[in-house]
Amino acid sequence: MTTATQSSAPGVNVDQAEVEKFSALAARWWDPESEFKPLHAINPLRLGWIQETAGSLSGKRVLDVGCGGGILSESMAVAGAQVTGIDLAEKSLKIARLHGLESGVKVDYRAVPVEELATEQPGQYDVVTCMEMLEHVPDPASVVRACAALAKPGGWVFFSTLNRNPKSFLFAIVGAEYVLRLLPRGTHSYDSFIKPSELAASARQAGLEPTGMRGMEYNPITQVYSLSANTSVNYLMSTRK
């Protein structure tokens, strides 16, 4: 995997510029017409694929790594899971907690690095999700290892990120950020994109076995997202411990 170059402090796997970027947008997390519109649009697809793969979430302990404002966390809690969401952007967590109070959905939000949580709660979660997060940290392989450590034996770990190739640069950066303006400019750095083969290798090294992949595609004419077999740009990967 390629890695970002900035970290807030030695030993902390975080790019402070990324934290500040999402903190600045925190108040708009739950506005479906904001910069987070794509996340609202793809969330039913992500949740559906998780349930299709791992089965019912009812009563299961679930960890959402890089939860942001809680879009996926809340939907998994509504599906019956006992959800913990972690993120290092305090402003995003504040919005997540506030929205949880307003919606009556219970999620335990914590500002803690996933590596630190892995030492506190190893093998405690039936399902771990790490969506649209790996491309925003200096050492994605470290996050993969921590996610693996947090999962119970037989537990599921789900990742989603961006492939690294000319098409993904054209679609995810030029198209999404500059032409269609689906995302703010500077949301992504091409050097931080991760090929499926790289993610699969990191997963196996961490004791996870990849079990499936799906691509996510956007139709600019219908403005609809869908899951597909095309993993050339956005993709999801399921793994099992």
Curated annotation (Swiss-Prot):
Keywords, alphabetical: Methyltransferase, S-adenosyl-L-methionine, Transferase, Ubiquinone biosynthesis
Catalytic activity: a 3-demethylubiquinol + S-adenosyl-L-methionine = a ubiquinol + S-adenosyl-L-homocysteine + H(+); a 3-(all-trans-polyprenyl)benzene-1,2-diol + S-adenosyl-L-methionine = a 2-methoxy-6-(all-trans-polyprenyl)phenol + S-adenosyl-L-homocysteine + H(+)
SUPFAM superfamilies from the UniProt entry: S-adenosyl-L-methionine-dependent methyltransferases (SSF53335)
Keyword set includes Transferase: yes
Gene it is expressed from: ubiG
GO biological process, one term: methylation
Gene3D superfamilies: Vaccinia Virus protein VP39 (3.40.50.150)
Record-listed E.C. numbers: 2.1.1.222, 2.1.1.64
The protein's name in its UniProt record: Ubiquinone biosynthesis O-methyltransferase
Family: Belongs to the methyltransferase superfamily. UbiG/COQ3 family.
Chloroplast recorded as keyword: no
Gene Ontology MF terms in the entry: 2-polyprenyl-6-hydroxyphenol methylase activity; 3-demethylubiquinol 3-O-methyltransferase activity; polyprenyldihydroxybenzoate methyltransferase activity
Involved pathway(s): Cofactor biosynthesis; ubiquinone biosynthesis
Protein residues bound to S-adenosyl-L-methionine: R46, G66, D87, M131
